[in-house]
Amino acid sequence: MTSSPTAAARTEGEAAPTVPTQVESGTAQRPGLAREMVAILDFGSQYSELIARRIRETKVYSEVLSYQTPIAEIRRLAPKGIILSGGPNSVYEAYAPQCDPALWELGIPILGVCYGMQLMVQQLGGAVERAERAEYGKASLFINDPTDLFTNVEDGTTMWMSHADSVLRMPEGFELLAHTENTPCAAIAHHSRHLYGVQFHPEVVHSRGGMALLRNFVYHICGCEPEWTTAAFIEEAIREVRARVGDKRVLLALSGGVDSSTLAFLLHRAIGDNLTCMFIDQGFMRKNEPERLVKLFKEQFHIPVAYVDAAERFIVRLEGVSDPEQKRKIIGAEFIRVFESESQRLGPFDYLAQGTLYPDIIESAGENIDPKTGERVAVKIKSHHNVGGLPENLRFKLVEPLKRLFKDEVRQVGRALGLPEEIVQRQPFPGPGLAIRVLGELTKDKVDILREADFILRQEVNRSGRYNDYWQSFAVLLPVKTVGVMGDRRTYAYALALRFVTSEDGMTADWARVPYDLLEQIANRIVNEVPGINRVVLDITSKPPGTIEWE
């Protein structure tokens, strides 16, 4: 998503061919005035949303759909192309997810990725079997046919493999496009039917030629135009908000992060004074943030903010609770209760605005259902406070104009709306705040200890000039005490973990290689300036297998 579309976005500036299809023009409304889209059918891969993000980077709108989406609905949406995601199953398993065979007769260009390629092969008469040698990680891709899908992709380029099955026999009419040392059929195609399959994952950052391949598919094979832009999204989002809300009043929970701040700017532009922002201080914010935030919005942005001090209410509700899922749900539910009570004082209000993003929806469990077990194919990771914690008796209607955007797209929208860089580049901060960074049972004393340690960490990271180098940098108070020595006295105090990660969208993350001198400065200040902490450790876990937050 960029500020303006450009034909120069095409690979080598080539014109896109017109691909004839048997799908009629769709009438579905699409965000951002996107006349064209690429649909991703999700078979349970954790990378499905990453595929969507990569397609959007080509300035083409994409949407993730269930693999069970009826053919009639796909016809109605009229995508210019379809991508079949990977998945955890084997296509020859009795209850493996299957797509409607009519999909292959739509005349729409289709790209199968990993499981998606194997499904294409199996349903069209080829054969898939357990590979003699599974292939995981980086592999050199040797290109047999450098045209079409592999135009401008370097022979021998690195691609990311993650499969234990392989294609034994291609369906009739298919040709071999590429192979690796361990995978004879790494890419295949039926050119006249516009059907393509790749065994690797072009969407992951480790696949060096992945974006070139996806651009070839989107521009040259599907014939898409680069029209998914920031300006177009803002225009359409404002139109949709006005159409949905009308002259009704909207209440927005403001946190000061880029999501809620961007949403506030967007809604204020759409409905003006019919928006009321409410900042609920639940007692788990970072040091000095509540005061700074309210002043900033009132005095600089001229957007009224109602401040609510609800710290005592939250602490009481969370007393004795140590399970992280319960914490999130309790905090989410209490947020809504506070909103309901305060809205009666400030209202009436008809709508509650939420800064829900695409990853929030995905991580709170996907929409695919396993036909055998009835369970969701995408395994639930953790519920987010603005998704999983909402009570059933919610009195507000929801408005969520950002729910199909990734974090980087939200930053672009915020910047285009005039949001200051200090907020645009603000690191993600969880809705439950420091409550989920104090492991185990919460107490006010523990939160205060963590708040001081977090303040020191942020001070030193900012002073180092490395704040924007990290997706997130924060501290976690551990539920264990350790023995230490300060002066001539023995201490017995809490251990604190430091967490620094790099990421593009929060879906995956790597632990950051933080300079030792910065770590030393942070650790020394914390143990010397924060009573209650005598040990600092560093978390070097990536996501997966871990999550970014500890709870």
UniProtKB/Swiss-Prot annotation:
A Pfam family per the record = NAD_synthase
Database matches in InterPro entries? Class_I_gatase-like, GATASE, GMP_synth_C, GMP_synth_GATase, GMP_synthase, GMPS_ATP_PPase_dom, NAD/GMP_synthase, Rossmann-like_a/b/a_fold
Quickly give the catalysed reaction. XMP + L-glutamine + ATP + H2O = GMP + L-glutamate + AMP + diphosphate + 2 H(+)
Query: Which residues carry out catalysis?
Result: 114 (nucleophile), 201, 203
Q: Where is the composition biased (Polar residues)?
A: 19-28
Question: What are the boundaries of the region Disordered?
Answer: 1-28
Q: Does the keyword Glycosyltransferase apply?
A: no
Q: Where is the GMPS ATP-PPase domain?
A: 228-426
Any Gene Ontology biological process = GMP biosynthetic process
- Provide the binding site for ATP: 255-261
This entry carries the following GO cellular component terms, namely:
cytosol
Is ATP-binding a UniProt keyword of this protein?
Answer: yes
CDD domains according to UniProt: GATase1_GMP_Synthase, GMP_synthase_C
Q: Which domain of life is it from?
A: Bacteria
Q: What is its EC number?
A: 6.3.5.2
Role noted for this protein? Catalyzes the synthesis of GMP from XMP.
Query: PANTHER family from the xrefs?
Result: GMP SYNTHASE [GLUTAMINE-HYDROLYZING], GMP SYNTHASE-RELATED
NCBIfam families registered for this protein in UniProt: guaA_Cterm, guaA_Nterm, PRK00074.1
Assembly, in brief, is: Homodimer.
Name of this protein: GMP synthase [glutamine-hydrolyzing]
Q: Which organism is it from?
A: Gloeobacter violaceus (strain ATCC 29082 / PCC 7421)
